A protein has these predicted regions:
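GST-like domain detector, emphasizing the conserved glutathione-binding G-site
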Residues: 1-118, 122-127, 195-198
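Acidic/histidine-enriched, glycine/proline-rich intrinsically disordered or flexible terminal extensions
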Residues: 183-199
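GST superfamily/GST-like fold recognition
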Residues: 127-152, 156-159, 164, 170
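Hydrophobic/aromatic-lined pockets within catalytic cores
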Residues: 55-59, 97, 122, 142-143, ...
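Short, mixed-charge aromatic SLiMs
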Residues: 77-81, 114, 160-176
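Charged/polar, low-hydrophobicity segments characteristic of intrinsically disordered regions
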Residues: 91-93, 169-188
């Protein structure tokens, strides 16, 4: 989403994590996505770092100017989700990959974080206003994955009404529709595919 919002066109290579291509592992041995190879040969392989890079590249990427306390809240929330929420999300959604893991307890830990966040959401399309901001593109993908694990349970939960509305706005947004495009898995002899496709 950050690449789209910053109008940064890249060569896209869709990969299967079950069969990681060697060129990907050569530039980022940890073998996770996303991976962004820059023109100068440097590599960014963390989502939040790619977002930060896009913001530095296009300083007017987001329309709203946040207050200092809002900026601090955003950074604290992103860190919370990138570390604590993701830890519990992985053990809830992929419990069979871990030993002696109680999926429900990790689900409830995620829920506790969402319940706290729910109290801070404005009654607008996005978190702070009707304009998308850094917190939206950084946090909503985690919440989307959390819902996917058990949509019926998530949708029926009465503790996070603002989170549910916020996520639904995201799921129905033009932004998500523009970036959630299915690409075939990259093969070495494939022609170059550019992303975003409509800039």
């Amino acid at each position: 989403m950050a690449l789209y919002l910053s109008k940064t066109v890249v060569e896209l290579r869709e990969v299967s994590l079950k069969n990681k291509p060697q060129p990907m592992l050569e530039i980022s041995p940890k073998g996770t996505v996303p991976v962004l190879l820059l023109d100068d040969g440097s590599v960014i392989d963390e989502s939040i770092e790619i977002i930060e890079w896009c913001i530095k590249k296009k300083k007017d990427m987001f329309k709203d100017t946040l207050k200092k306390e809002q900026e601090l809240f955003v950074e604290d929330t992103i860190k919370l989700f990138d570390e604590k929420f993701k830890f519990h999300l992985d053990r809830y959604k992929y419990a069979t990959r871990y030993k002696n893991v109680d999926a429900v307890s990790h689900r409830d830990a995620c829920l506790d974080i969402l319940k706290t966040l729910d109290k801070n959401i404005n009654n607008t399309k996005w978190f702070f206003s009707n304009n998308v901001n850094k917190i939206d593109i950084s946090v909503l993908p985690f919440i989307r994955q959390f819902r996917i694990a058990d949509p019926l349970w998530f949708d029926a939960n009465q503790n996070i009404p603002n989170i549910q509305i916020w996520l639904e706005n995201f799921l129905q947004s033009n932004l998500l529709n523009e970036v959630m495009i299915n690409f075939d898995v990259w093969e070495p002899n494939d022609p170059i595919k550019l992303f975003p496709t409509n800039l």
